[in-house]
From Swiss-Prot:
Belongs to the class I-like SAM-binding methyltransferase superfamily. RNA M5U methyltransferase family. RlmD subfamily. It catalyses: uridine(1939) in 23S rRNA + S-adenosyl-L-methionine = 5-methyluridine(1939) in 23S rRNA + S-adenosyl-L-homocysteine + H(+). Keywords: 4Fe-4S, Iron, Iron-sulfur, Metal-binding, Methyltransferase, rRNA processing, S-adenosyl-L-methionine, Transferase. The keyword Iron-sulfur applies. [4Fe-4S] cluster binds at C81, C87, C90, C161. The gene is rlmD. This is 23S rRNA (uracil(1939)-C(5))-methyltransferase RlmD. NCBIfam families: PRK13168.1, rumA.
């Protein structure tokens, strides 16, 4: 007769040890050594000692959480946000901005095997010109409006946010009060806020039709606050309620965009980044320049003010159309935009028949594997690669170095202070 036994529950003893942190990784975690391997501890800074509890023990590394901190680093700051540690938006408000930048630069230098020559940064607070706040109205409870908890889908009710542009942060209580007064609160999905050169935008996502009374209340609110209001009943539909089409200024150009178009969150760093790209490429009046993953022309259009000709290639048709509109609006007749998928075989795409002296690329996190071979074939004198993922940047850089290019400048872009996001830009020159 078969006999069945219940497996005994495995009891894991949570080991408490005392460690001293000697480094900070780019995500803001303290790094100590234990049993010959790296031990990652959120919330601890270099030179701090603590009693910690091992929570995960792998072959190559381990993780722990702080039980009791024994001393404070001089680099420790008091977080400005009352939601820090619960809200998933920021991870490093307890770290001085200088240490944040040093740790990110060190991580970038290790990956790229090259010193970081520049740190491009702006104000560490009030820098976000765009934010999306989740909305939820549980039965018989007040409206929830805020960001997601770290590692959770739960909403943290945000009353203030010190990294938001001041104009947006000041609006939060009034937006909450307006939305809470609507009859259709249970049908609200999220609200997006954008601070553009043209003023403040509010995009409200709702999952069922709003009543005429709710629409009227929202319109009155938009007029009283002087903002442009857009309703998004479906993912692809945008209804203008009030205000004008948004725009922002960049390097002497006025760039219009749709409320849902991607624009860089940090305006100050974006302006410096574009200026540095123009400088590094050393754009001259006779140059033919290629801009890959160009979006709506954040780099393309400023490049066109200096070069003989510029071609921008982008996979999102709406952004391509906006780039063309902005070229016409700004009187730039030497720029051409192509809508193409750069993850496919680019050699058969019409733009690829041209020759180019200089290339700029700004891919998404997946990097630019699909176009690296063609870029190398073009043999441009200079290449500027803007990256939001240092791992794929390092991979793509290896292909360029193996083809005879050299990294001559490396910059860390502090686009998202107080977070673990690490952005960068590199200048490659053909040797």
């Amino acid at each position: 007769m078969a006999q069945f036994y219940s497996a005994k529950r495995r009891v894991t003893t949570r080991q408490i040890i005392t460690v001293k942190v000697n480094d900070l990784d780019s995500f803001g975690q303290g790094v100590a050594r234990h049993n010959g391997k790296a031990l990652f501890i959120p919330g601890l800074l270099p030179e701090e000692s603590a009693e910690v509890i091992i929570t995960e023990d792998k072959k190559q590394f381990a993780r722990a959480r702080v039980s009791r901190r024994l001393n404070d680093s001089p680099e420790r700051e008091t977080p400005r946000c009352p939601h820090f540690g619960v809200c998933g938006g920021c991870q490093q408000q307890h770290v001085s901005i200088a240490l944040q930048q040093r740790s990110k630069s060190a991580a970038l230098a290790r990956l790229m095997k090259h010193e970081v020559n520049d740190i491009i940064a702006g104000a560490p607070w009030g820098y976000r010109r765009r934010a999306r706040l989740s909305l939820n109205c549980p039965p018989d409870k007040p409206l929830q409006m805020g960001f997601r908890k770290a590692g959770s889908s739960d909403i943290v009710n945000v009353e203030q946010c010190p990294v938001l542009a001041p104009q947006l942060a000041a609006l939060l209580p009034r937006i909450r009060a307006c939305l809470a007064s609507l009859h259709g609160t249970r049908h609200l999905g999220h609200v997006e806020l954008v601070q553009a050169g043209s003023g403040t935008l509010m995009i409200l996502r709702h999952t069922a039709p709003l009543s005429a009374a709710d629409k009227e209340k929202l319109e009155r609110f938009s007029h009283s606050e002087g903002l442009s209001l857009f309703l998004a009943p479906f993912s692809e539909i945008l209804e203008t309620v009030s205000g004008e089409a948004p725009w922002y200024d960049s390097h002497g150009l006025r760039l219009a965009f749709s409320p849902r178009d991607f624009i860089q969150v940090n305006e100050a760093v974006n302006q410096q980044m574009v200026a540095r790209a123009l400088e590094w490429l050393d754009v001259r009046a006779e140059d033919r320049v290629l801009d890959l993953f160009c979006g709506m022309g954040n780099f393309t259009l400023p490049l066109a003010t200096r070069a003989a000709s510029v071609i921008g290639v982008e996979g999102v048709p709406a952004l391509v159309e906006k780039g063309r509109e902005n070229a016409i609006r700004n009187g730039l007749h030497n720029v051409t935009f192509f809508h193409e998928n750069l993850e496919e075989d680019v050699t058969k795409q019409p733009w690829a028949k041209n020759g180019f002296d200089k290339v700029l690329l700004d891919p998404a996190r997946a990097g630019a594997t699909g176009v690296m071979r063609h870029i190398i074939k073009l043999k441009p004198i200079r290449i500027v690669y803007v990256s939001c993922n240092p791992a794929t940047l390092a991979r793509d850089s290896e292909a360029l170095v193996n083809a005879g290019y050299e990294v001559t400048r490396l910059a860390m872009l502090d686009m998202f202070p107080h977070t673990g996001h690490l952005e960068s830009m590199v200048l490659f020159e053909r040797m």
